[in-house]
């Protein structure tokens, strides 16, 4: 999990991390961990970490393509096998591990765990934030917009583009990830072509035109 800004700034000297996952694709039966099944105490959390029974109380959720998970700072989480996600997050590398599933680092040794810090920051309540196929859908001509997440750290939406769309954000940069299809981006006298799997950074105040048929993950701060 990741700490919030207050804890991370005081202990690590950098910001914490809130993030969002969008499931781009997944295998049948794939699951991820999102918080706990039910509320638990800090004491039980610590005991289960140390006796290696933490997975018994983790909230393992079957996922589907297009699902959305808002991972607020302090939420226990882990991506399971067979899942491809696009992640929107705060710019921070602070992560506290309580289990690494027996994996080894590049040096062949177990990676460091951060149990004491995790006990300080982990939310031991069952998550109450909706997840899955969520988000208000707005149709605007040839564009369908699905609002995924709006918080004080970032906002994210899914764009289904069928023809053209102008983008210009005065207050923030814009990040675009092409999930499906192909897009031509026109700006001033030039243009570039991007396709599935590509991402592009658009500076604040720059007006661009998107042309094509595509599914796009749009995020800004």
Describe every region a protein language model picked out.
Residues 1-65, 80-182, 186-188, 192-199, ...:
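Active-site region of the double-stranded beta-helix
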Residues 36, 73, 204:
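Conserved residues at beta->alpha junctions
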Residues 142-143, 203-207:
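Short small/polar-residue motifs
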